[in-house]
């Protein structure tokens, strides 16, 4: 609402200060979160047993949205993968809490006219700025080559995508959608209970549109 002089409740400098404060608090939280993750990695926890259903899967590639190698440590089928078949798309934290990570808002929420000032809080910009691992994009090229040489478009083995421990939140739509759109892909999503299944289904509908 403007007053009789055509001015709003905040002057331009005041509004800019509020924006700067919000952004600084967001990145202060991310900094504390990274320290917490590094600390958690040093804590000795009771040994966990792998889930047999997951452990029996033949894993050729591993895409992680987490920041730690917990899955690789727990599941032997993934621990032997070569580095080119492992991708920490949001960054990886081991002992260095200063390593950059992606933690922000999804690209679907970005409006260049409204959000330009907050660009640095969006995941797609953070991936660009921090040069996080996007090796998974090369996997699609390998898949297309494999299927192009297979008789009648059928490869020797099925192209299976297993999703475990991800909420399918639309903030990661730009990474998840290519998997769902890949021809001949068989998508398997693991869930904990019926409530989590319903939540996953809702998010999946948002991703697929």
Label each residue range with its predicted role.
Residues 79-80, 139-156:
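Short, conserved, surface-exposed binding loops centered on an aromatic residue
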Residues 148-209:
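SIR2/sirtuin-family catalytic core signature
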Residues 1-134:
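Extended, H/D-rich, highly charged conserved domains that either
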Residues 114-142, 192-206:
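Catalytic lobes of large eukaryotic enzymes
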Residues 43-44, 64, 141-143, 168-169:
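A conditional alpha-helix N-cap/helix-loop micro-motif detector
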